[in-house]
Amino acid sequence: MTRSFRVEWTDGRKMADDKSNSIGDNSTNKRLWSSSIRGSALIFICALLAEPARATTHWVVTEDGKIQQQVDSPLNLKHPHHLVLFMQQETRVNYLKKLEKQLVAQKIHIEENEDRDTGLEQRHYKEDADCVTAKVPLGDLDLYDGTFISLESKDINPEQFLDLMSALPPDLEKPDCAKLLDLPYSIHAFQHLRGVQEKVNLTSPLLSKDDPIFTSLCLKLGQSVDEVGHRIHQALLKNSSSWVLYNLASFYWRIKNEPRRAVDCVVRALHFSPRQHKDVALVNMANVLHRAHFSADAAILAHAALDLTTDLLTSHYTLGNIYAMLGEYNHSVLCYEQALQAQPGFEQALRRKHAVLCQQKLEQRLEAQHRSLQRTLNELKEYQKQHDHYLRQQEMLDKHKLIQEEQILRNIIHETQMAKEAQLGNHQMCHMGQQKFTLHCPFDLPVRYHRGELFENVHYIQFGEEVSVASSVALVSELSVNESHSPQQSYTVSLGREPAAHWDKETTTTDESRTVLWPRRSDCAQRFPTIPPAYLLPTYYLPPESRNLKALNILLESISPPPSAKMPDCSLKNVVGNRDPLESMSWALEKELRDPQAAEVLLKRSGGRSLEQTGALIAQALEKMSGPRWMMQNEAGLFWRAKGNGTQALVCLRQALHSAPPQHRDLPLVNTANLLLHYGLHSEAHELLQQALQINQSEPHTLLSLVNVHLSQGNLTGALAVFRQALSLSVHCGQCRASLPLMRCLQFYPFLYNLQHQACSSGGACEVEEDSELEDWDTGSSSSGRQEVWDSDAMPVSALEDSLLFEKVVVDSNGSGEASGQDRTREPKAEGGEEEEQDWRLREELIGAFEGALDMNGKTGDLRGIRVLKNDRVMGARGGGPCFGNCEDDEGAEWITFQVKRVKKPKSDASEGWVGEGDVRQTEPTASNSILEISGPTIPSPGPSERWKDYSSLGWPGPEECQRTRRVDLTTVASTWLAVSAKNIDITEHIDFATPLQEPAVEPVCNANLPASMHTLDHLSGVANRGGIHYTGESQLREVLQNLGKDKFPSQSFEQVGTRIAKVLEKNQTSWVLSSMAALYWRVKGQGKRAIDCLRQALNYAPHHMKDVPLISLANIFQNARLWEDALTVARMAVEIAPHFVVNHFTLANVYIAMEEFEKAMHWYESTLKLQPEFGPAKDRLRTIQCYLLSKRDRRAP
């Protein structure tokens, strides 16, 4: 059980001063001072007791009485010595707690008041009395029910107006009122209504068979409707002014459901009707316009009919239908009631009245629900604003908070150091005697060592005696970095001639030179967290002075200042032919991109003149032919580089390339290459630098420019090799010092940048690196014997975390300043199997304290802790391991090694094949291949290590290729899944696929209340707030789950596999494999909280080198939930754990795409293709990004 308490600081010096000042006072003052202090202390204690809620949980007291920091405490700061920042952080923590309580209360209020009545409409229809009476909703009633006022009700017999005795012709005619009479515009005919004016566009729904309009024409008028229409037409030919005939014609056209012709007839009927009979035509027209969806016009006509008619039933009923359709429910009900007064018990009016009342009350209830939902929406928006504010405050909190992984590492290192001191005592450097029978140790302290071939003859250990160690071999180095046996003790490093001795050292102080040449790891991580993009790398200018030609300032001294500030113009001088390959690159240099290094060089070369003054002088020199023209064009190119005008710079440099003498062509070649590289054209720059090296191979500017090309292409190993070659040149280079900070960080801390050596092929020989200046600092091969003293902070060996990153440092153990170098050629390990096995067993005997992974001499092991140090000769190494930078084996050197636990690797003759992108390929036999499974695009396994170097760069496409390239929708999330088979785990050994299922289906359940630890990543907001994330699920992974164990058992349904996982997970909650499978199940189901619960459980129990399996799933969930920062964090962790898996690189690239970090996404798609050059999805996405950037003309190198 732990107890939380608060720690308060006081200023000890102030208290001491107060106490010393009070000594000389009288006893009264002493008593007053003591009483005041006691009173203040009492008040302070009472205040603490009165406010227990303000106590923080930064410090805890463990069960064994130890006081320690909590790993996930927000008060673990990057700068723990900063008291003010600590207090501000505590205030921010308390504020966030209050804000969190407010958010929770606000969310509860929203949920309690949220209207979740989804069955309102159905319940209303069942419970409302009007709805029950109406029997059906208003929408199911025919509100276009046809009505008319019969002529018989006007005491008019239609038979008297028709000739019923005449014979009928074979072709019956139809009454076309518009042709029979050309009616002038008449307001009395309501021709001003919009429905009448737009009669040609009138439409009408189909008539039901029961529509009353079919009874408007009496059967006595004819045997069929067409016969009646013919007789009406004949009658109108004889009497074209009869309002009765026009009304009959309108009845005919209403039956035919042709509203345009009906309007033509009814308008003429209105024109000729007497006032007392106009209601017949008005009701007719109202029905026609109502059915044609001009209900507002129909209402006007129906009201006009009410003023004239005696048939109130028909007019009110018609008007009620019209108002119901218009949504004027109150008017509609009033009209239906008037109709019922005219004819009580009229069922059609009664049902419609109740249906209208039912609909009116339903809409009122729906409007009330809408207002409630709108209020809830506004509250949610306000909640979102508060939540965003909370996240911003959390970001400010995390800004100063120490990264949890780093705090865990510090705790591990501390615990390891404490364990070493407890178990092995204080550590010291011991040496083997010349006869190899004794060990000489300076202190009488316990010594432990492993017996082996080199020291099995040791019979005793001699303590404290002064011995000469110049020719002895350092066997054990376990010197504690926190202790020293004398105040004067310090580490010394044997140094030869200083690296980069000719590189403008006079411009830097000793401290600056020391900081640049011997950087600390923390400085490198802060200054260069990643390899800078091409436009941020230093650029170089190869000056003519390197060929003993006239310098720029000498050429400019002979020229008088020009009267006007002109710019150098190279476009009209010595025009280069159209076949120049550099001409096609000018479009890529259109964007303004200043080169600060070029501006600095030009300022120094021009004697302090301003940029504009220098440009004017160069322009005047070009016009007056002062000096060789190609040299001035070279200087003009430098000017335009400083101005950021790449197009003009390229024009000048092309002219210089065309006119320069062959022996001096490397000057414009190198300068042009630096221009192109600054704009990201690293492939083209590489080609120009290769041409320059053919002319002069000993020019450091050329080599360092080539270093930048390799860096921009991601070839860090190649960059280091060329950098060593440049260091070996004893040539003055005033600009070269700009490359030192980054390159020295790459040399000393290669694993900070994921730098790895490619393994030699089995049949080929490894290239032996030449001796260079780089090794002088660690081998002490120079005869000068100069030494430098390093403090413990700057010494890499004092930082145990550096050893965790597999870095090696060399410390001179004898102080002589001299040591013999050994051949660094890597020997093939074809016949040394027995020695390697003994070598491995010796490493295996070491014990450890924490987890990791290590690959040494082709054997894989689990890293379990750190043990300081064994000399390579003691360990039996033969130089076959990875080597970066300083590779010489010094007999007096100490090496950081690791304690490992051996893991046997399964033997296989060949890896499984993979299918992707429409073709099938069987990979070459290799023991290190891993099979990856992924849903979305199929992710193949990486090929053998010999094939990795086949891919260098995809390059940038041209406009034609972009037009041909199939574009990929980058907003589509490709779900990824790292199968446990990639970790050589057989899933059928964990899940029972053979036993038939008898019981009903169940779902896997993980421990949702698993305590937070250093492994569960609860410091991420997505994990801590997993119950509130918006996760839509990844149903595309269903097939992956169904095919688990497909090699041995047939595919099963999704529910069956979930049940099998649930059965075994219930018995074994500590299996990270089963927890990962359960998380995959919940990813398919779309339940993010349950999936994260299972992934927390998997992360808690998984070994470190297996954690990338749940981390990839977690990254996909965060990306789906749009928690991109969290997704980025866990995806990076997965890549760091297993950088050789394609799926990890591809997932990280996808996260950067979602964040619209296109250049970073391109980098990781490139790294994906380096692992698997034929992987189509990465190629397609990379091409899509490139074409998008090119279309914006805003390209920078990846």
Swiss-Prot record:
Keywords: Cell membrane, Cilium biogenesis/degradation, Coiled coil, Cytoplasm, Cytoskeleton, Membrane, Repeat, TPR repeat
GO biological process, any: cilium organization
Gene: ttc17
Entry GO terms, CC: actin cytoskeleton; cytoplasm; plasma membrane
Gene3D superfamilies: Tetratricopeptide repeat domain
Function description: Plays a role in primary ciliogenesis by modulating actin polymerization.
Primary location: cytoplasm
TPR repeats: 313-346, 630-663, 700-733, 1071-1105, 1108-1141, 1142-1175
Subcellular localization, as worded in the UniProt entry: Cytoplasm; Cell membrane; Cytoplasm, Cytoskeleton
Top-level taxon in the UniProt lineage: Eukaryota
InterPro entries xref list: TPR-like_helical_dom_sf, TPR_2, TPR_rpt, TTC17
Compositional bias per record (Basic and acidic residues), positions renumbered to this chain: 821-832
SMART domains membership: TPR
Null allele phenotype: Morpholino knockdown of the protein causes curved body, a lack of defined brain structures or necrosis in the developing brain, and eye formation defects at 24 hpf. At 48 hpf, show a reduction in number of ciliated cells within the olfactory organ.
Region (Disordered): 771-792, 814-839
Protein name: Tetratricopeptide repeat protein 17
Similarity annotation: Belongs to the TTC17 family.
Entry coiled-coil feature ranges: 358-399
